[in-house]
UniProtKB/Swiss-Prot annotation:
GO cellular component assignments: cytosol
Binding, L-tyrosine: 38, 169, 173
Protein name: Tyrosine--tRNA ligase
Motif residue range(s): 'KMSKS' region: 231-235
Enzyme's top EC category: ligase
Function: Catalyzes the attachment of tyrosine to tRNA(Tyr) in a two-step reaction: tyrosine is first activated by ATP to form Tyr-AMP and then transferred to the acceptor end of tRNA(Tyr).
Catalytic reaction annotation: tRNA(Tyr) + L-tyrosine + ATP = L-tyrosyl-tRNA(Tyr) + AMP + diphosphate + H(+)
Chain residues that bind ATP: 234
Gene Ontology MF terms: ATP binding; RNA binding; tyrosine-tRNA ligase activity
Cell compartment(s), UniProt: Cytoplasm
Quaternary structure (record): Homodimer.
Name of the gene: tyrS
């Protein structure tokens, strides 16, 4: 650990937006090996998406460097709602929904961080026990309203209005940092760029209650933008989730492998644990042999393995290779559903049918003449096999549990035909 400068590594990766006291943090790291740091997430949903993943990658880097990560599940703050990054009030969730989301997020975090040298806590455990008078007497007196109004997250909402509930959020997050510092030995908070005001409020509270020399540090990460200026984290189909039931490992892998050459090195620095030398070599490959897309393949491999494990990566690569080569016959029925979930689809009955009629009836071909021409020219594949016989009969029961027939026209145009009884 002494030979690894975590802060210099983060700077090289472009992962630091602001720090509260770099000199003080460096001094602390030089003298102590017990730094504990945290990042929080409110249970507003039952899965993180890749945009949420960014600060947790920083936390993971500290864990790999030997430090102690703590994750705060915001069971308390989540019942109120963080105004950061929003122009409108959040819709409050039911207690049942919040608890379900807490359990799901906890499971995801354990998958990413393991169980060694890692803790998960829930701020419901302290915020839920605090009554109104305690809140006002012990903490409310320490916050100046004029300072709170100047925080960007609040100031940006004043024109259209912000409820007292969301206005109070920064106090609750500050209390989180104070409690973690006092009772759990946590010295540092990590968050997105929009969390700067909340983080500094927590540090101020710690210094007021525990003394100005109490170690407390904050670090925010930059807003992640793509080369075209749009916000990172969305695909054409919406958010890219960590939950494999929401975004399959194949879709997850495809998101990363399809990244722009202009973005791929930045993402390798942010989302992988590859050494500087390997990333530098991949950057050179992007410049000299971009058509090989080696950087994208490495990115997709590393992030998919981190989130979905070796098994998820293997499935993603199996499906990708099958679609690329056209050899789909070895895919399972489940893999077919995943791989062609967004492909054009059609329906057909259970009976055997002449291929030409099948192509026209499912509207894959516009006419029998065109269908015969494409079959004769070798442009039609049925379940991975090239068919050049216009008298060929399609047997829906022949593959994929009788649920599908996969038609490929040309090199990449797939249609998934659902068989209806």
């Amino acid at each position: 650990m002494a030979n690894f400068d975590i802060l210099e590594d983060l700077k090289w990766r472009g992962a630091i937006n602001q720090e509260t006291d770099e000199e003080g943090l460096r001094d602390y790291l030089a003298k102590h090996d017990d730094l504990a740091l945290y990042c929080g997430t409110d249970p507003t949903g039952d899965s993180l998406h890749i945009g949420h993943l960014i600060p947790f990658m920083i936390l993971k880097r500290f864990q790999l460097a030997g430090y102690k990560p703590v994750i705060v599940i915001g069971g308390g703050t989540g019942s109120i709602g963080d105004p950061s990054g929003r122009s409108t009030e959040r819709v409050l969730q039911s207690e049942e929904t919040i608890k379900h989301n807490e359990e799901a997020l906890t499971a995801q975090m354990v998958k990413l961080f393991g169980t060694e040298n890692f803790r998960i806590v829930n701020n419901r455990d302290w915020l839920g026990k605090m009554n109104l008078l305690e809140f006002l007497r012990d903490y409310g007196k320490l916050f100046q309203v004029n300072n709170m109004l100047n925080k960007e997250v609040v100031a940006s909402r004043l024109k259209n209005g912000i409820s007292f509930t969301e206005f109070s959020y920064q106090i609750l997050q500050a209390i989180d940092f104070y409690i973690l510092n006092r009772d759990h030995g946590v010295q540092m908070q990590i968050g997105g760029a929009d969390q700067w005001g909340n983080i500094t409020a927590g540090i101020d509270l710690i210094h007021r209650l525990e003394g100005a020399d109490r170690p407390a540090f904050g670090l925010t990460i930059p807003l992640m933008l793509k080369a075209d200026g749009t916000k990172f984290g969305k695909s054409a189909g919406g958010a890219v989730w960590l939950d494999p039931e929401k975004t399959s490992p194949y879709e997850f892998y495809q998101f990363w492998i399809n990244q722009d050459d202009r973005d791929v090195i930045k993402y390798l620095k942010y989302f992988t644990f590859l050494k500087h030398e390997e990333i530098d070599a991949l950057e050179e490959k992007v410049k000299t042999e971009p058509w090989k897309r080696e950087a994208q393949k490495r990115l997709a491999e590393e992030v998919t393995k981190f989130v979905h494990g070796e098994e998820g990566l293997k499935e993603a690569q199996t499906v990708t290779e099958a679609l690329f080569s056209g050899n789909v016959k070895d895919l399972t029925t489940k893999q077919v559903e995943i791989a062609l979930a967004k492909a054009p689809s059609a329906e057909s009955g259970e009976e055997k049918k002449n291929l030409v009629d099948f192509l026209v009836d499912t509207k894959i071909e516009s006419s029998k003449r065109q269908a015969r021409e494409d079959v004769n020219n070798g442009a039609i594949y049925v379940n991975g096999d090239r068919i050049q016989d216009t008298d060929f009969e399609v047997d829906p029961a022949a593959a994929f549990d009788g649920k599908f027939v996969i038609i490929r026209k040309g090199k990449k145009k797939y249609t998934l035909v659902h068989i209806k009884g």
